[in-house]
Amino acid sequence: MFKENTIKLGIAPIAWTNDDMPELGAENTFEQCISEMALAGFNGSEVGNKYPRNTVVLKKSLELRNLEIASAWFSTFLTTKPIEETVEEFIKHRDFLHGMGAKVIVVSEQGHSIQGLMDVPLFKNKPVFTEEEWEKLADGLHHLGKLAQEKGLHIVYHHHMGTGVQTTTEIEKLMDMTDPALVSLLFDTGHLVFSGEEPLYILKKYLPRIKHVHLKDIRQEVVDVVKEKELSFLQAVKNGAFTVPGDGVIVFDEVFTILANSNYQGWFVVEAEQDPALANPFEYALKARKFIQEKAGL
């Protein structure tokens, strides 16, 4: 289905140890995490909170297992803080990822975000940016995009539940306001379906701008409870709203077909944060790997 040597398969460490709720998977070590990723048949991962930030140390651990770094999340605060604060941290982040050989930087605006707040209802309290904030976001992303390109990297914007860029309308607005040469898109199946969007619409409309893909599934019965009981994003994660591709309700066949028939080259990263005490990360990594092999031939 996919042309040879166009796709690398990664898996996010958040299934082993959760960055937002460190108590989930606190017992899982960095070495266990990357060893199980390799054993499950993946080529690499994004960066988690237990990963060493010394590139020499990290490279050695990964090379022993034939793994690479695909990217790492970066929180921007362009709508709520002076741009200089974001830029200072971004440059360090960019240089680290450049040193690890990554080609994209995952960015997500966290101004007004509720994704990390345990008791704030996800659907009821979703932030909405003012026009002035949209302008700050677009201008700031252009600046970060230029900084990334100084080292040969691209920024990929991660639409995300509980943030100001979550819905189809918001994604379209961001794409309309930003230069395709400077701001690319991360396509995340799980966040789109969780939000009630149509992922294939976004995929088809912005295919040339998509430079990174997160493969994530959802358990619809949990999402329904999140809405009914007005739960937060973190409560949704703890209750199992997300799972690996093939274990939920999302149909991936057309997603893979569209991407295979496109010029997409880069990473597919399985990202399915759930409680590792309830969903063994290695077991679910194997499930995901088998599903991708069967459905995408990768």
Swiss-Prot record:
Its cofactor is glutathione; Co(2+); Mn(2+). Keywords: Cobalt, Lyase, Manganese. The keyword Transmembrane helix does not apply. Pathway: Polyol metabolism; myo-inositol degradation into acetyl-CoA; acetyl-CoA from myo-inositol: step 2/7. Gene3D superfamilies: Divalent-metal-dependent TIM barrel enzymes. GO terms for biological process: inositol catabolic process. One of its GO terms (molecular function) is manganese ion binding. InterPro entries: IolE, IolE/MocC, IolE/XylAMocC-like, Xyl_isomerase-like_sf, Xyl_isomerase-like_TIM-brl. Transmembrane segments: none annotated. Its EC number is 4.2.1.44. The keyword NADP does not apply. It holds the Pfam family AP_endonuc_2. It catalyses: scyllo-inosose = 3D-3,5/4-trihydroxycyclohexane-1,2-dione + H2O. Belongs to the IolE/MocC family. This is Inosose dehydratase.
